[in-house]
Structures are given as structure tokens and as C-alpha cells.
Amino acid sequence: MSTETLELIKNSIKSVPDYPKAGIMFRDVTSLMEDPKAYQATIQLLVEKYKQGGFTKIVGTEARGFLFGAPLALELGVGFVPVRKPGKLPRPTIAQTYDLEYGTDTLEIHTDAIVEGDKVLVVDDLLATGGTIEATVKLIRQLGGDVQHAAFVINLPEIGGETRLEGLGLNVYSICEFPGH
């Protein structure tokens, strides 16, 4: 990726201090999508990275993972599978609960969305602790999917999510990094 492209993408991501709580610097990818050149460059970088990967499904996590995973799936000519909060998917699902900083959360996937042997790429907007993606990977593997790659627009390396996901056997790719939380 060229320095110019990286700067275009990085500069389009607005940083919002003290959101959602004091001491957090929120990295807002919705501002990236407001800039069609930056959004297109982001999707094209992902396409170039994964076009030879042989994936059969792209899985995106609620909600911002949909915004990058679905266009990537279209470009690669493969199916897109959403992983959502409980009660949002109409067909039979399986669920995975995971720990948050203060409490727990749960994700669900349709039981027929992944079939044995599907080669899956997981996509989300931001990697922090890795908890959401770990839960997503567990769901995919429970359904027989082969998931070895996870892609992000942003990585916050100081939080340690990349190390956590590598511990699950994932190859982790992020377009850009930001310091802090």
C-alpha cells in the first residue's frame, strides 16, 4: 500500500475524545465512509490482500464489520454472513457469550450460514481486545468453518487483541494502527 493511500485512509478517520466514556479516544470509521475515495481505497486494499485467498464466505461482525465485509464479499464474488446481537437473526442460530470490560455480551450466527469446509475470512472495523472476534471464530468453527484470517481497518495494538487472536491461530491484518484506547 502506498504511503499516500494509507494517509488518505488514516486522515479520514476522525478521533473523538472521551467517547463513549472519559479517557477513551474513539476512532470513528463512519467518517471514512463519508469520503468515497477513502472508503473505496479501503475496500480495494482488502480486495488486493485477499483476492487469491480462496475464501468461500466473508463474515462481518455487528455492526461496522458489515460496512467493510459486505462490499469485500461482493468484490470477491463470495457470500457474506452477518454475526449479530441476540434476537436479530430470523432463522435458527447458535450463540457465543464473551466477556466485556464490565460484563458479558453475546453474538449469534445462523446455523446454516456456514457449512463444513467453508474457508472464512472475518472482517471488522477495529481490533481492540479481540473478544468479539474470538467469539465469532468460535461460532464459525462450531459450524465446521475453516477460519484462519481476520482483517481490520484499524488496530489498537496497545490493547493486545492481535496477540489474543494470533493465539487462536489467526493471521491478523490491519490497514492502519492508532495509539491508545
From Swiss-Prot:
Instruction: Please cite one Gene Ontology biological process associated with this protein.
Output: adenine salvage
Where is the protein situated, by its record's location annotation?
Answer: Cytoplasm
Q: Reaction(s) catalyzed by this protein?
A: AMP + diphosphate = 5-phospho-alpha-D-ribose 1-diphosphate + adenine
Domain of life, per lineage: Bacteria
UniProt xrefs under InterPro entries? Ade_phspho_trans, PRibTrfase_dom, PRTase-like, UPRTase/APRTase
| Entry GO CC | cytoplasm
Q: Which Gene3D superfamilies match?
A: 3.40.50.2020
Q: In which pathway does it act?
A: Purine metabolism; AMP biosynthesis via salvage pathway; AMP from adenine: step 1/1
What's the Enzyme Commission number for this chain?
2.4.2.7
Query: Member of which family?
Result: Belongs to the purine/pyrimidine phosphoribosyltransferase family.
What is the protein name for this chain? Adenine phosphoribosyltransferase
What is the source species? Aliivibrio salmonicida (strain LFI1238)
Q: Which gene underlies this protein? A: apt
